[in-house]
């Protein structure tokens, strides 16, 4: 007991093994503790969907971003920049089938998850709701700059066709996804012509002739700067 008390009083430091044990048992993040002490260090957050409970962890990631974006409505200096090789979440998450397809593709690629037919995959309503909130609130960002890979739509079309060819998406459902994609392109055309969202905030779109290997995003507000790199379909590395 005395050894424990000495550690709690700070007289004796915890060993790495002891610190790891405390972290695991109590759910304390050692990264965050270190980050508080060393402000000059770059801290990274791996927003990885847990394959043991993919829906819940995916929901938690989106909900965290929704809470963040919800604070930006009254920030006149909020800005988002992204260079993408896929259609950004800020645009496709409002469309249920396109959002479902992105999650379905991740599940198919993950060997730990037994992938179902697209029509059999049931997305919980709370995920649909938080996706809609994410897409709607993102329009409150006062300035958004999109730089897109010229293949951004072709990548998605090829993926959809692949799953159709292996009979995991029916012809009828493929047509439904196509209709959502056409609706999305109409929305993009309107945004590109106006240069603004429905809330009157600025949007700039540039199509690059150079292909991107990943998607990179940067969000800046009066209070913070956030950088994100998309990894493995729906996951991200954030700092």
Over which residues does each language-model region extend?
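Charged, low-complexity, helix/coiled-coil-prone segments
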Residues: 2-5, 12, 90-101, 113-131
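Charged/polar, solvent-exposed surface patches and flexible loops
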Residues: 6, 24, 32, 60, ...
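Hydrophobic transmembrane alpha-helix bundles
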Residues: 22-35, 70-81, 108-125, 232-238
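Short, charged low-complexity intrinsically disordered segments located at boundaries
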Residues: 35-36, 50-56, 94-99, 189-190, ...
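Helix-turn-helix/homeodomain-like alpha-helical modules used for DNA recognition
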Residues: 38-116
């Amino acid at each position: 007991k005395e050894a424990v008390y000495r550690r709690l009083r700070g007289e004796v430091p915890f060993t790495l093994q002891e610190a790891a044990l405390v972290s695991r048992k109590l759910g304390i993040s050692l990264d965050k503790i270190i980050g508080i002490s060393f402000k000059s260090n770059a801290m990274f957050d791996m927003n990885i969907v847990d394959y043991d409970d993919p829906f819940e962890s995916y929901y938690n990631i989106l909900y965290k971003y929704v809470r963040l974006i919800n604070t930006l409505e009254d920030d006149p200096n909020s800005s988002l920049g992204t260079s993408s090789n896929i259609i950004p979440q800020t645009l496709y998450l409002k469309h249920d089938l396109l959002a479902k397809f992105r999650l379905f593709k991740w599940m198919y690629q993950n060997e730990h998850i037994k992938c179902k037919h697209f029509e059999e995959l049931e997305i919980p309503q709370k995920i649909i709701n938080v996706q809609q909130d994410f897409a709607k609130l993102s329009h409150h960002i006062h300035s958004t700059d999109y730089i897109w890979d010229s293949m951004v739509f072709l990548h998605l079309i090829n993926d959809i066709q692949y799953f159709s060819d292996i009979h995991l998406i029916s012809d009828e459902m493929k047509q439904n996804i196509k209709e959502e994609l056409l609706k999305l392109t109409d929305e993009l055309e309107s945004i590109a012509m106006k240069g603004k969202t429905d809330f009157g905030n600025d949007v700039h779109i540039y199509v690059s002739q150079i292909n991107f290997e990943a998607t990179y995003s940067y969000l800046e507000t009066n209070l913070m700067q956030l950088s994100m790199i998309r990894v493995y379909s729906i996951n991200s590395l954030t700092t």
